[in-house]
Amino acid sequence: MGFTVVSRSGSPTRRENQKRRVCFRLLLRLLRRGFVVLSAESDPKMPNYSIRGINVEFPFEAYQSQIIYMDRVIESLQNKCHALLESPTGTGKTLCLLCATLAWRKSLGSFSTRKDRKNSAIPWSDSDEPLSQSGGGGGGAFPTIVYASRTHSQLRQVIKELKRSSYRPKMVVLGSREQLCVNEEVNSLRGKALTNACQYLCKKRGKRQCNHFNRLPDYLKHNPHIGDEPVDIEDLVNIGKDSGPCPYYITRELHKDVDIIFAPYNYLISNGYRKFLKVNWTNSVLIFDEAHNLESLCADSASFDLPSVLLSACISEAQECVQLAAARRDSLNDVSINPENFAILKGLLLKLQELISKVPIPKRDEGFTKPGPYIYEMLKSLNITHETAPKLIGTVEEAAVFLEEEKQRTATNAGSKLEIIADMLKLIFRENGSNHADVYRVHVQELEQNSTDVMKGKVSRTLSWWCFSPGITMLDIAQKGVGSIILTSGTLSPMDSLAQELKLDFPIRLENPHVISSNQLWAGVVSTGPSGYVLNSSYRNRDVPEYKQELGNAIVNFSRVVPEGLLIFFPSYYLMDSCITFWKNGCYRNSMTVWERICKLKKPVIEPKDSSLFPAAMRDFSEKLQDRATSGVVFFAVCRGKVSEGLDFADGAGRAVVITGLPYARVTDPRVKLKREFLDEQSQLADVKLPRSTLLSGSMWYSQEAARAVNQAIGRVIRHRHDYGAIIFCDDRFEQPSQQSKISLWIRPNVKCYSRYGEVISDLARFFRTERSNFPARLVTEQENNIVSTLLPVESIEDNPTPAFGNSNLKNVGVAQNELSRLEAFPPANRASPLERDGNNVKRNGLTILKHTGKIPRIVKGDVMQGCSSRKAKLVELSDDEETPVERRCEVVDLESDNCETQTCVTEVLASSTCLNTMGLKKKRKVPESQGSASSSVLTAKGNGGGDKKEASASAFLSQVKEKLNTEEYKKFIGYMQALKKKEIKLANVMQSIVQLFCGSERDHLLMGFKDFVPVKYRPAYEECIKTRKRQSIIFGNSN
C-alpha cells in the first residue's frame, strides 16, 4: 500500500512540477517514517473480542495465547479472586493485562475522564468539587485499579503500552519527590533530607514557601482534564517547569479520584506508603507486574538491619540535637523544643548499643539467633514497649526535622540517620506487630573489621530482625477487602511454592506458551567441554583449574558460531571474576590465552559489581555491538544481577545465552540458613491432612530460588514473535529431570541433552545458518539499536506485531495527517498556491493527493514521476493502447541529503524498491524504440511475457502483500528480497521462507501470485515447497 498522486490531464507546467516536487518530498518523508494516511471512511476499528461477555478492544489481531491470557484476567476480576499468570517475555502480556482489565472496568461504567463522563448517563458538570475534597476510590462506586511494577522504568513502558490501546481511563503515575520536585532550591537533596525540606517549605506558617506548591490549586481548577490522557513522570515534570504547579502534589491530589494508578511496588508492600494512598481498597484491583521477585521484596520490606556504624551515627545526631536545642533556648529564649527529650533519646540509643555489644556470640560464623518475639524483650529492658514506643517515635521524628531545618539554614545536604530509627520502631510496633513476631528471627552478627568504619578498632555488629514469611504483607493487603490480586511475570513457576509463600489462595493460574515457533529456539544441555572434561560449577569443582580451562574453551567455540551478541551468565561474581582472571593469566607457551582467543572473536564487556558503573558498561556494550568492524560482543554477567533482570536483548543484541551453573545462594549465609530452618519447621507443624508435595521445605525453596534466577537470565533472549536464539546450559546438573522440570514451560520441550561437545557446535552452527536465512536482519531504528535505551526493564515494543490495519496505527495516522496539514508551511521556490481540500483528499492547483484506499490507481499518460529534484526528471511513458506505466529508471537527486546520493523515483519506491525485481522482476536491457514502448518496461515477469498484465505488476502484487501481512511479516518479506539481491542467501532458501510466510487459507493467492515472479526453471521446486508446507500444516498445525 502506498501513496498515489493523480494530476489533471495536459502537459504540466514548470510551476506545477515544482508544486508536485514539494508534495513528493513530503510523501517520501512520510513513507520513510512508516506513516500511511488512511481516509476517514476507511479507518478500520481495532479488533474486538468478546471474552466472558466483556468486549475487549485490542490494537492487534491477538494470538490464541493472548486471548487465553485475557480470559484468565477477566475471570479473576469477575469472580473477585486472585490469579498467578505466567507468560514469556515477548508475548504481549502487558498490553493484554491493560486491555482486559480496562475493558472489564469500562463494562461497569464509564471512566472518570471528562469525555467519558460527558458521554455517559451519569450527571457531570464542570463545577465538580476539587479533587482535594473528593473521597478516594477511583470515581466513587467503581473499583480502583492499582498497577504496580518494580521500577519507574518499567512503569514508563507500561504507560507506552496504554497509549497504544483504545482505552483512556483517568490515570495517574505516582513518584517520589526526587523524581518530581521542580523546586531548584531543594531538588538537589535526596531521601529524607528532601522530604523534610519539602514539608518545611509547604507549611503555611513558614517564612519560606514553595511557589510551585502555592500554584497548585489554580492549576487544578483550570485544568481538570489532567490525567484524561496517559501522562508519565517526565510529562508531569514538564508541566511543573512550564506551568508552575508542583508535580508531586499534582499526583497526590489526582490519585484520589482516578480509575487506574500506576505506582512502584513499595506503594503497596510498604505499610507506610499504603497509608499514604487515599484509595478505597474495597473491591479494588491490584496488579503486580514483573512479580517474580515479589516474595523477597515483601520479606525485605518487613525486615531491618541496624549496623553499629549506623547506630553510632544516630547517637551523634541525637547529641547534636541536644546542643542545638540548648543553644537556641539560651540565645533566642526558644522553649518550643526541649533538649531534655533529645538527651533521653541519646541515652536510650547508647543503652541499645551497649545491649547489642553484650550479646554472647560463641562462633562468629553462626552469630546469635533468637525467635522473633525476643526483640520485644530486648527493647523492654530499655523501657521501650507498645505503650511508650509512639512517644519515642515522635521524639525521633522531631529530632530529625529539627536537625534538617538546621542543615537547611547552614546549606548542608546530608540527610538525617535518625529517621531510620523511627522506621525501625514503626515496623516493630506496627498494628498487631507482636502477632506476626513468630515468623521473624532476631539475629546479631559480628562483621569483619572495615578500615572505613567509624568504629575502626572495635567490634562491628549488626542487629537484624528478619521476616521469613512474605505472606504477612500480602495478607495485610488482602484484609483491606481488595477484590483481586493479579501477579504476572515471565517466570513465576513453580507456582505452588509461590502461592504458599504469599499465604494467599490463587485459584486462577496460567503458564502460557510462547508465540514463537519451536524452530526459533535452540536449547541444549552441554555436560562436557571440548576435551571431554565434565562441566559442573558446584562448590567442590568451581576452583579446579581443569574446569575453568574447559569452560573457557567452550566459550571460545560458542563465540565462534554464535552471531552478534552472546550473553554468559555465572552463578556469582566470585566465580565470574575467578574464571576471567584464570583465562587472562593462564600459562600458554607459544599460544594465546583463553581470554585473548575470546577477544579475537568478540569484544568483551563485564558486568560491574558496583551498580553506579552499570550504565557505562551498557553504553560500552551498545557501542561495541554497533561497531561493524567487529563480529559481535560477549557480555559476562551474573544471575540475579542487573543484566539478568529485565533488560531487553532483542534480535542481534542477544542471539544466545550461556548458563554456566546453578546460582544457589551461599549456604553459609545466616539469612539463607535461617530461612531454610524456618521452612522446615513450618512443614513439620503443618496440618497432617495436607499432601507433603504441597508443603515447601527448606531444600525445595533453596533449589527453586536458583531455578527462578536461571529462568530470569535465559529470558533475556527471544524478546518478540520474530526473534530467534539459543539457550546453552553448561552444567551437567541440568541433565537431571528434577532440574529440567524447573525450567520455564515454554522452553522444556526444546531442551536436548548432548553427550558430545562436537554435536553441540555442529547443531548450533546449523541452527544459526537456518534461522539467519529464515529471518534476515530486520530494519531497526537507531533507538532500537541503542541498547543503552533498554537499561529499563521492559516489555518489547514488538510484543504483538500483528496490526489490525496494515502497517500503520491510529497514532501514525494522526501524525501523518498533521504533516499533510502543514504542507503549506513548506512553500516551493516560486510560491505555489495554497492547499485546497476536496473531501478526504488534498489539492494544489489540480494536483490531488489521495488518502490511502488500499489500491494503487493507474497513472495517466504524461504524469511526471520524480523524487526530490526537478533537475533530473523523465516522463513516465504510456503506449497508446495501455494504461499501465512503462517505467524507466529516473535518476533523481535528493536535495535534502548532503551528498546528493541518487535515489529511485516514486514509482520505484512503491514497486521496485521492494526488490521484487530480484525474483524474476528485473531490468531489461535497452532495446530499439521500434520494438515498441511496452518492451522498454523495467519490471517484467520472467516467463510470463505479459509484463503489461495487471496480475504481473509489481505494484499490484506489493499492494496485495502489504494488505495481508502485518508490519513485521512485511519487513521480513522486504528483507528476503534485499538479501537475495545482495546474494546473501540462496534462491532455494528464499522460496522456502516465502512459502512459510504466505502459508494460510487467506494467503493462498499470494503463494500463487508469487509464482509469476519465480524463474521458470525454479517453479517446480517452488511448487514442491508449497506442497511440503501444506502437508506439514495438516500434520502439525499451521504456525501462522
UniProtKB/Swiss-Prot annotation:
By its UniProt entry, which InterPro entries does this protein fall under?
Answer: ATP-dep_Helicase_C (IPR006555), DinG/Rad3-like (IPR045028), Helic_SF1/SF2_ATP-bd_DinG/Rad3 (IPR014013), Helicase-like_DEXD_c2 (IPR006554), Helicase_ATP-bd (IPR014001), HHD_RTEL1 (IPR049909), P-loop_NTPase (IPR027417), PAH_sf (IPR036600)
Where in the sequence does UniProt note compositional bias of the Polar residues kind? 930-939
UniProt motif (DEAH box) ranges: 289-292
> Enzyme class, one word?
isomerase
TM ranges: none
Tell where it localizes.
Nucleus
Query: In its UniProt entry, what is this protein called?
Result: Regulator of telomere elongation helicase 1 homolog
Name the species this protein comes from.
Arabidopsis thaliana (Mouse-ear cress)
